[in-house]
Amino acid sequence: MRSPLCWLLPLLILASVAQGQPTRRPRPGTGPGRRPRPRPRPTPSFPQPDEPAEPTDLPPPLPPGPPSIFPDCPRECYCPPDFPSALYCDSRNLRKVPVIPPRIHYLYLQNNFITELPVESFQNATGLRWINLDNNRIRKIDQRVLEKLPGLVFLYMEKNQLEEVPSALPRNLEQLRLSQNHISRIPPGVFSKLENLLLLDLQHNRLSDGVFKPDTFHGLKNLMQLNLAHNILRKMPPRVPTAIHQLYLDSNKIETIPNGYFKSFPNLAFIRLNYNKLTDRGLPKNSFNISNLLVLHLSHNRISSVPAINNRLEHLYLNNNSIEKINGTQICPNDLVAFHDFSSDLENVPHLRYLRLDGNYLKPPIPLDLMMCFRLLQSVVI
């Protein structure tokens, strides 16, 4: 017969093991008499994009490039050893203009996040001739910044957030490109000292008729190219400089051209008036019959007849209008009857080489009198 201790010892061992294990509490809804709740299906998890800390959160500046042979070269930029007067700081995620060495004449700062130009922006580099600030976020320019750059010739500030044309522009400026901003104001007299300006680009802004006063362009004696396309003009701008060669007014809301408007431009060779609201009623008979005009764009308007042209015009775009018929005798700059006798006189032959008439109400064939007049035509689209 076994001793009671033989039975007691295994029981003590089991009790000690049970005390060492944690006690599990029953889950809610799993007690006796209750049905277990179904487990929710796991929802698929997709990586969520990191939200910026603030709406204007910008990418960090890029790390400095390789060491330069020029000790004054900003770490954020590149100084080409074979072009010591140039400084390339473009596409570096910069928030402000770095310290520019005095030796720099050509400065490239496009494709950054610069928001303003304080007075000290170019204080060391007064010999700058070329500045490219395209595609930044510039809203504010200190008036004293540019007046301290007497040798500046080219200023590019396209694709920024300017609301008016900068003041105190250097008098030696030759090209001013301010397209794709928010410009709706032109300060009085801002161009008055820019006698050397050749190109003024103000396309894709918010310029209306009220912005242009009779003296807005005063001082631009040598301006050759004026671009006012993609604005909200309803009228032709007044007192455009008479030295103009190229005039861009596409994509406005212009309905009429004053009688004799272009007569005061002896050098005007290129006109673009596509995508406006021009009609025959708003076009005086000889609006474009000016001596030096070579290229005329009038597509995407509401014109129903071909306007009179000069003998030297080479390219005429009249596509996408309301033209129903075309008469070569009426639009020919020369008398067709006299033309037969002097067919070999190329000096008097109209110079038109390209004529576009598609998108109207015309149908082939091309009228014979049209071909007899414009004998140098190389392409007619109808």
Swiss-Prot record:
Protein name according to UniProt: Prolargin
Gene: PRELP
PANTHER family: AGAP008170-PA (PTHR45712), PROLARGIN (PTHR45712:SF8)
InterPro entries: Leu-rich_rpt (IPR001611), Leu-rich_rpt_typical-subtyp (IPR003591), LRR_dom_sf (IPR032675), LRRNT (IPR000372), SLRP (IPR050333)
Glycosylation sites: 124, 289, 320, 327
Signal peptide: 1-20
Organism: Homo sapiens (Human)
Residue pairs linked by disulfide bridges in the UniProt entry: 332-373
UniProt-listed GO biological process terms: cellular senescence; skeletal system development
Location of region: Disordered: 19-66
Compartments in which it is found: Secreted, Extracellular space, Extracellular matrix
Disulfide bond keyword on record: yes
Role, per record: May anchor basement membranes to the underlying connective tissue.
MF annotations from Gene Ontology: extracellular matrix structural constituent; extracellular matrix structural constituent conferring compression resistance; heparin binding
Subunit structure: Binds the basement membrane heparan sulfate proteoglycan perlecan and triple helical collagens type I and type II.
Keywords on record: Disulfide bond, Extracellular matrix, Glycoprotein, Heparan sulfate, Heparin-binding, Leucine-rich repeat, Proteoglycan, Repeat, Secreted, Signal
